[in-house]
Amino acid sequence: MQWQDHAIILGVKRHGETSVIAEVMTRDRGRHLGLVRSGRSRAMQPVLQAGNAVEVIWRARLDEHLGEFRVEPVTLRAARLMETATAVYGVQAMGALLRLLPERDPHPHLFDALEVILDHLHNPADAGELFVRFELAVLNDLGFGLDLAECAATGARSDLVYVSPKSGRAVSRAAGAPWADKMLLLPPFLSIEGNHAADFDSLSAAFRLTGFFLHRHVYEPRGIEAVAARDGFVQAALKALNPTLRTLSGPNGVSA
């Protein structure tokens, strides 16, 4: 069996003296593993770095086998991604999110989103907003999508400022007022009413929002914790927007 696809390197593990097992996110075949012979060579090591875009050819006798990759470089961005904490943690955190999905399960929209985010990790505001949308997309693909288009109580599509922690649906200001202290905030940049640039406060609220539902629907039921890289990314992104902030802490690995 053989196929060819666009891919992004997520990580590698040593295999024997000279080879590695590469983990990649492909556009049409999802997250996939494969053996790369001589993957530890001087020529291949720079190519097989997390965040790099590559072209892979996968071969195996049977579909269920691990198989082998032949890897050709396309965009080698890994060195640039090592320049800032936001980028370093972001690459690790997105890889961990993709590992929540079944192996070999196609998610082409997540592949496309990953490529966009990797090229914006140098800008904390853009990276933070894109990362939140990526987490929302992963939640949706896992079957736990949030409904932020209309008020759960009234059906209104304007002045949506809350999200119900029970239903994961948006709630308008008026309908949610009696329970405001129990609601999650809906960041303006996630509202359907118009374009709003992400800032420190809205990103903080957004990280709390996605962190809450990832913990409730994914991490807690599976008995796992969010990777430290998520908290590292959140802190780096928020600190870049507010350099005077010394420590950032909050529930579910989200920053306040």
Curated annotation (Swiss-Prot):
Kindly give the HAMAP family that the UniProt entry links to this protein: RecO (MF_00201)
Q: Which domain of life is it from?
A: Bacteria
BP terms from Gene Ontology: DNA recombination; double-strand break repair
Record-given protein name: DNA repair protein RecO
Q: By which gene is this protein encoded?
A: recO
Cellular component per GO, a single term: bacterial nucleoid
Which PANTHER family does UniProt cross-reference here?
A: DNA REPAIR PROTEIN RECO
- Protein's job: Involved in DNA repair and RecF pathway recombination.
Q: Which keywords are on file for this protein?
A: DNA damage, DNA recombination, DNA repair
> What family is it from?
Belongs to the RecO family.
SUPFAM superfamilies on file? ArfGap/RecO-like zinc finger, Nucleic acid-binding proteins
